[in-house]
């Protein structure tokens, strides 16, 4: 007789926006403001077109609902103290119009939490894949990287180096910004447009909780030097 204890998991939150169809229609009403068409920008608009979708006032209800999910993730799931305000610092589009429109491994180094809100996901849409940051259960170097022979009988949550989610429209996925991730095609027959709003979040200490050393202070206390 024995037991196994899984310690120190990486927690990803998957939710669904209740007012998705309303938010989707509102977004398409203003889509032309963010509709980049240059082929080199087809995968993401970050740093090339517009990274501040959250500042569009007509989308306030969308981002307010996103923030409700972020607070559930922080306070209900991860069980942090309610001493933080949520600040969205950047938001941009992720688009795939063909199977090869994939995003390479990366993380978001300037934020605490990142989110993906899926506006549209046609059949065979790209998945989002996450990389195991530690993989202590990999008993041999390169155990999860071989594409020819593997010593693992069945891949599961204990021995895998990657994990993927096939999101549906209306889903919101939240994860630590430091977690490496990518998008990956699931079929060469993908057609249509997979469209998601991606965003970065920092946690800012509330005015009555500035005595904590963890967390940013409100940007009103910052001073810009140039």
Model-derived regions: residue spans:
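Non-heme Fe(II)/2-oxoglutarate
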Residues: 1-83, 92, 102, 193-226
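Short, proline-centered helix/strand-breaking motifs
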Residues: 174-178
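Short beta-strand His + acidic residue motifs that chelate non-heme Fe in jelly-roll/DSBH
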Residues: 103-106, 181-189
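Catalytic core of non-heme Fe(II) oxygenases with the double-stranded beta-helix
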Residues: 95-172, 193, 207-215
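A short glycine-rich, His/Asp/Glu-containing loop-to-beta-strand
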Residues: 87-95
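Residue-level recognition of well-ordered beta-strand positions that form the cores
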Residues: 16, 94, 116-118, 198-200
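Short beta-strand segments enriched in hydrophobic/aromatic residues
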Residues: 119, 179, 201-203
């Amino acid at each position: 007789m024995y037991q196994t204890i899984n310690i120190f998991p990486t927690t990803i939150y998957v939710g669904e926006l209740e007012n998705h169809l309303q938010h989707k229609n509102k977004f398409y009403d203003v889509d032309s403001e963010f509709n980049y068409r240059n082929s080199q920008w087809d995968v993401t608009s970050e740093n090339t077109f517009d990274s501040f979708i959250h500042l569009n006032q007509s989308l306030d209800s969308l981002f307010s609902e996103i923030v409700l999910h972020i607070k559930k993730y922080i306070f209900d799931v991860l069980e942090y103290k309610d001493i933080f305000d949520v600040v969205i610092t950047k938001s941009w589009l992720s688009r795939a119009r063909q199977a090869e429109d994939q995003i390479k491994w990366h993380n978001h180094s300037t934020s605490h939490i990142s989110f993906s809100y899926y506006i549209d996901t046609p059949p065979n849409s790209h998945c989002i894949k996450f990389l195991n940051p530690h993989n202590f259960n990999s008993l041999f170097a390169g155990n999860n990287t071989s594409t020819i022979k593997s010593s693992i009988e069945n891949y599961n949550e204990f021995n895998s180096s990657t994990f993927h989610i096939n999101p549906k429209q209306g889903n919101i996925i939240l994860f630590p910004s430091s977690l490496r991730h990518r998008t990956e095609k699931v079929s060469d027959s993908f057609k249509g447009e997979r469209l998601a709003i991606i965003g970065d979040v920092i946690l800012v200490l509330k005015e009555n909780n500035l005595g904590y050393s963890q967390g940013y202070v409100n940007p009103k206390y910052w001073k810009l030097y140039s």
